[in-house]
Amino acid sequence: MEYLLALDQGTSSSRAIVFNRAGQIVASAQQEFPQHFPQPGWVEHDPFDIWNSQLATCRAALEQAKLSAADMAALGITNQRETTMVWERATGKPIFNAIVWQDRRTEAICESLRAEGLEDEVRKRTGLIIDPYFSATKLRWILDHVDGGRERAARGELAFGTIDSWLVWQLTRGRLHVTDVSNASRTMLWNIHTGEWDADLMRALDIHPSLLPEVHPSAHQFGQTDADWLGASLTIGGIAGDQQSALFGQACFKPGMAKNTYGTGCFMLLNTGDKAVQSHNGLISTAACQSGTKRSYALEGSVFVGGAVVQWLRDGLRAIQRSADVEGLAASVPDSGGVVFVPSFTGLGAPYWDPTAQGAIVGLSRGTTIGHIARAALESIAFQSTALLQAMTRDAVSTISELRVDGGASANNLLLQFQADLLGIPVVRPEIIETTALGAAYLAGIATGFYRDEAEVAQQWRASRTFHPVISRDEAAHRIAQWEMAVAQVRLPTTRGH
């Protein structure tokens, strides 16, 4: 058994990847599934679309690899975080669609919690801010809006879970109702200091404890899959939320090690070791993957519009035909010509947290070309990520000596060079950029003895290319100051319509 199977359940598609012992990809399969938008600001998934697409990709990846489930040493799961579902324990039937992490319907519940003065207590206990993003208010909304939901929960008839819990329930035909620390820490119900569900927060949200899954370390022998699904029973050895899994897949095992995922948005995580650092700079504190008995924590910040700015250049401005064309267009000019692009189409995320900020392109002149705007758009991804890393540096107890990167936009050399220039530290792209799935595979491997420990996994990590800063720190500081001035402009109260 020389292989590991990783399930990577994302927001728009499910994937499965077969890895060999060296952490190389042997085969992969992907399947998209429908998104449902019943009302503005609402986003839902059909739980069975998630399960069926995930199972189909597992079978397809094994077939493509010309391997069977019996050849797999273990199975690991990584998943879109916070997305919330509730199902009947007796039948496994969901009582409502999955409410997705992007869904904003619970803002009124969040506002009432803030009005009760719970914000500081929630931050202290969970590391999170009160926001519809996290699972707790989504769970409360389902219980409030499904007939008999709260009564059935009190009788122990219902189960709550994030996506990982739902997949394990299906894979084991309802034998296991579990999650891991990284997913639990995104619910706004898990006390990251005690490592337990928080009874006071459950009372505040009127959530019955019988709903909640058992929580285990991320690397743990959770149980066996039903043999009927894949032709043989597999040990479920790893579970982690997608961003923590990517941190693990990047072998960021020591305090001060950080990774940034450049996707539609950007997610930066910094390992803070066994300390849950309380952020004073607009970041959240979260559980990192736990592969042994010792707890591990991370600081996290997210950028709402990362690679999505390139999609806007393609679909909104029609400046490029394919997203990949942006690098050539941006490289057609030596710099942005003084143009700064602030892509706050949906407000600004960490560390600014300004939902009212609007997008802007500033510094335009008669000599501005589409090349300058494309370059400014790419640079905006690096500027926002720089603001995150600077906030982390202010919060963190250890210095950050390099940034490991992954995600689709990490293929863009111009972006990564500019990122290194702004940060003044090396930016490193690994050989295997499927780090999210790789993290789940590594966790499963450690749990089952396929790998000895984190040290063995760390030896496998290989850099593909390192980008070193080439501009002076004075020049970098000047560019960052220009960015912050542009951000200040989009955060001014709007005078439109007056």
Swiss-Prot record:
Its EC number is 2.7.1.30. The keyword Nucleotidyltransferase does not apply. One of its GO terms (cellular component) is cytosol. Pathway: Polyol metabolism; glycerol degradation via glycerol kinase pathway; sn-glycerol 3-phosphate from glycerol: step 1/1. ADP binds at T11, R15, T264, G307, G408, N412. It catalyses: glycerol + ATP = sn-glycerol 3-phosphate + ADP + H(+). This is Glycerol kinase.
